C-alpha cells in the first residue's frame, strides 16, 4: 500500500487462516499460534486494527491436512491522484532503496518502519517519488526488472552495488524512482 502511494496509518488488515485440525497434541497448536502471534505483533506494532477475517482451523479430512496458511491483505482508501504505479517513468531518474530496520530475529522494528513509511508517503504526495515497488524475498534485482518492463526502460546499476545488495531479502523495503533533479532535496531530508 505504501509503495502505491497509500498512507500506512489508514491501513486495515484482514486475515484468513487455514490450519490442520487441533487435537490434544501440543505440536499441532504451534503453527496457528506462531502465525497469529505474528499477525498480532504487526497490528500492535503499527497500531492498526484488523477489520475481519475468517478462520478455517479444521482443515483436516480423515488423515489429510491442509497446508498451514495465513492469508492476509490490507486495504486503504485514497484519492486516485495520489496513487502511483510501479513501472519506471522517465529515463535518467534515480532509484533509491528505503530499508526498514529489523532486530536480530528479522522482526521489523515497527517504530522505525512507521517513521520510514510516513516519510515515503510524504515524498509520494509531494511528487518526489514517482514510482515505487515493495521488495520481496527476491530482492532488488527482481524488483528492478519488473519496474523496467512496464515502459521498456533499462537500468544502469552503480559499480558499488554488490551482488548481496541485489539479491538479499528485501521484505518490508521500498524501491523508489525519484527524478534526478529532486535527489538533492531528498538527501537534505
Functional labels for PLM-detected ranges:
Residues 1-4, 8:
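C-terminal substrate/ligand-recognition segments
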Residues 14, 27-28, 108-109, 132-133:
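A generic structural signal for short
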Residues 73-79, 109-117, 156-160:
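A general structural motif
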Amino acid at each position: 500500500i505504501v509503495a502505491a502511494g497509500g498512507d500506512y496509518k489508514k491501513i486495515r488488515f484482514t486475515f484468513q487462516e487455514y490450519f490442520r485440525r487441533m487435537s490434544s497434541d501440543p505440536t499441532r497448536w504451534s503453527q496457528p499460534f506462531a502465525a497469529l502471534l505474528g499477525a498480532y505483533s504487526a497490528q500492535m506494532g503499527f497500531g492498526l486494527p484488523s477489520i475481519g477475517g475468517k478462520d478455517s482451523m479444521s482443515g483436516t479430512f480423515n488423515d489429510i491436512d491442509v497446508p498451514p496458511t495465513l492469508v492476509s491483505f490490507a486495504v486503504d482508501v485514497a484519492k486516485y491522484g495520489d496513487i502511483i504505479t510501479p513501472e519506471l517513468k522517465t529515463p535518467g531518474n534515480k532509484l533509491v532503496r528505503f530499508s526498514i530496520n529489523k532486530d536480530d530475529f528479522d522482526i521489523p522494528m515497527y517504530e522505525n518502519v512507521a517513521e520510514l513509511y510516513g516519510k515515503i508517503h510524504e515524498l509520494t504526495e509531494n511528487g518526489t517519488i514517482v514510482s515505487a515497488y515493495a521488495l520481496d524475498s527476491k530482492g532488488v534485482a527482481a524488483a528492478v526488472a519488473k519496474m523496467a518492463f512496464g515502459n521498456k526502460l533499462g537500468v544502469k546499476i552503480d559499480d558499488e552495488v554488490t551482488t548481496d545488495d541485489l539479491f538479499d531479502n528485501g521484505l518490508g523495503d521500498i524501491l523508489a524512482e525519484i527524478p534526478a533533479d529532486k535527489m538533492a532535496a531528498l538527501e537534505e531530508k
